[in-house]
């Protein structure tokens, strides 16, 4: 997979922090961007996007700091370092495969004959699907449109991430498989889904400072849960 030259910081002293609109991401990064912690003069600005868009932007080297899928990180490690704080780990819970019909006796075998709407080919969700049933066909659909795609009959099944994992039943859809639970049964381990990365060309000193700021931002959120 090819990558493009990295982009410089657009304005001196301003660091773009990109993440999904999920509440857990906002929780992690809010104190950094809202001026609630001492960042030593480093200014952070939020940029929101779905995880596949963030994966692609990081692949192009556009962002200083970003949430990414751990599947995508395999293609990013040469230019981004994985930060130690704020990873997304599924403990017997993860991306969910749903369909209009109730689950058959052997969902895994049935999926080999299905067209599955997926949220992106760089997502960890997609990687787990390929491990679970490599014969399944897929079509890439925006993560927040997958339920509609399945309900309307444009795909046989959907691979859900974010809030769709919780709301699919409201659309009359049925759970066929939970990739986090499947992964646990296979490995007895939690499923690593995503993490935060920082661009290596910022230099070790600034990278370490950003890592400290992210840790402090998470600690601030934990101390101010209201």
Question: Could you say what each language-model-derived stretch is?
Answer:
Residues 40-43, 62, 77-79, 94, ...:
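A generic structural signal for alpha->beta connector loops
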Residues 1-88, 105, 219-226:
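N-terminal hydrophobic or amphipathic helices and topogenic motifs
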Residues 4, 10, 117-141, 197-226:
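Ligand-binding clefts/hinges and TM-proximal coupling segments of bilobed small-molecule sensing domains
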Residues 65, 80-81, 115, 157-159, ...:
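Structural motif
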Residues 82-106, 131, 184-201:
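Hydrophobic/proline-rich hinge and linker segments of small-molecule sensing/allosteric domains
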Residues 144-226:
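Pocket-lining segment of extracytoplasmic ligand-binding domains
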Residues 75-77, 129, 167-170:
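Short loop/helix-cap segments at secondary-structure boundaries that form the rim of catalytic
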């Amino acid at each position: 997979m090819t990558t493009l030259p990295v982009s410089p910081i657009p304005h001196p002293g301003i660091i773009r922090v990109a993440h999904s609109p999920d509440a857990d991401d906002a929780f992690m990064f809010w104190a950094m961007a809202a001026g609630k912690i001492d960042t030593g003069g480093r200014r952070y600005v939020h940029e929101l996007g779905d995880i596949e868009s963030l994966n692609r932007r990081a692949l192009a080297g556009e962002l200083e700091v970003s949430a990414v899928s751990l599947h995508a990180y395999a293609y990013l490690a040469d230019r981004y370092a994985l930060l130690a704080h704020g990873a997304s780990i599924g403990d017997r819970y993860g991306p969910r495969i749903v369909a209009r019909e109730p689950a058959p006796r052997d969902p895994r075998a049935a999926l080999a004959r299905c067209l599955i709407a997926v949220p992106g080919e760089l997502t960890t969700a997609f990687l787990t699907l390929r491990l679970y049933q490599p014969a399944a066909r897929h079509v890439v659909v925006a993560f927040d449109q997958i339920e509609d795609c399945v309900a309307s009959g444009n795909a046989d099944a959907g691979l859900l991430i974010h809030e769709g994992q919780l709301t699919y039943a409201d659309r009359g859809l049925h759970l066929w498989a939970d990739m986090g639970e499947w992964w646990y049964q296979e490995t007895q381990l939690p499923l690593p889904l995503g993490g935060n990365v920082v661009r290596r060309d910022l230099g070790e000193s600034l990278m370490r400072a950003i890592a400290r700021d992210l840790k402090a931002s998470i600690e601030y959120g934990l101390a101010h849960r209201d």
